[in-house]
Amino acid sequence: MLDWNFIAGLIATVAFDIIYFGAIIGTITVIILDNRNPVKTMAWILVLMFLPVVGLVFYFFFGRSQRRVRVIGKKSYNRLLKKPMAEYLAQDSCALPANYGRLISLFRNTNQAFPFDGNRVEVYTRGLSMIQSLLRELQKATRHIHMEFYIFEDDAVGRMVRDVLMEKAKQGVEVRVIYDDVGCWHVPNRFYEQMREAGVEVRSFLKVRFPLFTSKVNYRNHRKIVVIDGRVGFVGGMNLAERYMRGFSWGIWRDTHLLLEGKVVHGLQTAFLLDWYFVDRTLITSARYFPKVDVCGTSLAQIVTAEPIGPWKEIMQGLVMAITGPRKYFYIQPLYFLPTEAVLVAMQTAALAGVDVRLMLPYRADNRLTHLGSCSYLAEALRAGVKVYFYKKGFLHSKLMVSDDELSTVGSTNVDFRSFEHNFEVNAFIYDTETALQMREIFLQDQRECVQVFSKNWEKRPWHRKAAESIVRLLAPLL
């Protein structure tokens, strides 16, 4: 006599296996056909093979490529670029630095990033001085304030900034604010509602209603941009939160941020207005947001953005070119060091060619997993002659790079797959000896608070530490 229960169970099991393995094989096929970085492809395949259920869920939420998605139509994009392009064409012929003309052209061709001369640059390395300057400039606003931050906290600093924005909105100043929905998950809605009630236009970037059930959580706006009246701008690594001023019980919070004055602010304005279109579907192109600006200084600068929705990885490509260009030195301090193969090979090549390449990382990081992954790359860098330092005075959150007393960049971009592949980022690239010398001195001052890592000693770290680093490195493209 047939056991129908057994047969039904067998059919259900076979059907489940077919669907289960079909989903895994289908997902692996999609990953392979996507023609992405082989390292990232293998990382996803390993996750799917050894952690199939978790791997399927993670790939659905975090792994799908968005590079074919278009945020804004070409016609609208050209309309938005019309004013800064006119300003660029109207300026006297820029004398491009001989050593970085190709880098400037790269950013123009891939990012529509116009180089503007006649700018003034002010550098901040502590949160207090940056916030004080920001509050002063906000108080001077008479026409508009445009602001976007990854984190806009409901704390003493956030409330000070909020109150100024509300006051300005009541005075008739146009105020627009973008905050990242994931970066501000824990901030109560009432904090933003108070601004809206005062007339501030507030939008969240890629709102995530159910964080664990949407791939939007993977694509975050990590930019920190402020534009005031189209004349003054801020960009860098600092968010609006008290900890950027206060630091921790065990040390200071060390970061780098810029105040910019001059035509280069048009680049920040364009970046913000593109993001505003993304969150509000309102295209703002009026010339009053791009006022005629007098010469404020001597710096030549570009504002370069990167996002997960275009064909190019603009800032990563620029970083590779910036590393291989110097003849004397290249200093860099990122929060994380999970480099793509192109970036790592560029650093090794420069060091082997005799360039003084220095890498500075935080001794204590905010993410242990990412810190382990960062450490897994250091042996290869050290072997090629890269000098590695761990900053011990506090928490190093800075994203600064300087080379040959000619080029420097500050922004939101880390040296990791997330910044290069998934985040919306922005950096100011400055071609100016005075600024580069200042950045170099900042780096060297930080170096005095560091412990240097030597290859021979680094190889002696415990085997279990090496094993942990190696395991995390397998997942580096996914972090």
Residues of each region from the PLM?
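N-terminal localization/anchoring segments of enzymes in phospholipid and broader phosphate metabolism
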Residues: 1-317, 321, 325, 365, ...
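Exposed, interaction-prone extracellular/peripheral surfaces
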Residues: 260, 318-321, 345-348, 352-356, ...
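Helical hairpin unit composed of two closely spaced alpha helices linked by a short loop
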Residues: 326, 336-358, 362-367
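Histidine/acidic-residue-rich catalytic or RNA/ligand-binding cores of hydrolases
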Residues: 341-344, 371-373, 403
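Active-site donor-binding acidic/aromatic loop of nucleotide-activated sugar
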Residues: 388-392
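Catalytic-core elements of nucleic-acid end-processing and repair enzymes
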Residues: 399
